[in-house]
Amino acid sequence: MRLTVKQITWLKVCLHLAGFLPLLWLFWAINHGGLSADPVKDIQHFTGRTALKFLLATLLVSPLARYAKQPLLIRTRRLLGLWCFVWATLHLTSYALLELGIHNLALLGSELISRPYLTLGIISWLVLLALTLTSTQFAQRKLGKRWQTLHNVVYLVAILAPIHYLWSVKILSPQPVIYAALALALLALRYRKFRQWWR
């Protein structure tokens, strides 16, 4: 049975809640001692992982819609992508304001260049920014065929973001490896699309 427009609307409401509720939890954790002895790192990792979760969810939509024969699921993709950008921006902001500090923002540029994992992170964020700014129907009409070409760059983020995560942790743990494996699996589902590009 195919999902109806009404069901998709309710699904969007649930996805908005999924994007917003972690923010409420983070505020609660900050104010009620729910973080570790290094709260700055906790905030950075939490915001980064949440952004990565929404990135993976965004990449899951197309194959899920195709294999489950639920074409209306595509309507949730933009919403998931926007939440991915929101959390990626919170991740970047937490580093700039909490790690460097508001009085040391001038160091941000040199930090991004001198630390390769930060370079990958800012490239990913800039791509997400471009995709967010062009996610409207107006931008899609304006760009025409170039719109799809631009939005295919999300696959670059699917490669860079997990590497950024793997590179940023001092002690390798299963979690970043799992995220990287999931991203690789979602890219592998598109092998036919990639093969067509290389022909």
UniProtKB/Swiss-Prot annotation:
Keyword Transferase: no
UniProt cofactor note: Binds 1 FMN per subunit. Binds 1 heme b (iron(II)-protoporphyrin IX) group per subunit.
CC annotations in GO: plasma membrane
Subcellular location: Cell inner membrane
Topological type in the membrane: Multi-pass membrane protein
Transmembrane stretches, start-end: 10-30, 82-102, 116-136, 153-173
HAMAP family with a match to the protein in the record: MsrQ
Gene Ontology annotations of biological process type: protein repair
Name of the protein: Protein-methionine-sulfoxide reductase heme-binding subunit MsrQ
Organism in which the protein naturally occurs: Salmonella newport (strain SL254)
The organism's taxonomic lineage, starting at the top: Bacteria, Pseudomonadati, Pseudomonadota, Gammaproteobacteria, Enterobacterales
Single Gene Ontology MF annotation: oxidoreductase activity, acting on diphenols and related substances as donors
Assembly description: Heterodimer of a catalytic subunit (MsrP) and a heme-binding subunit (MsrQ).
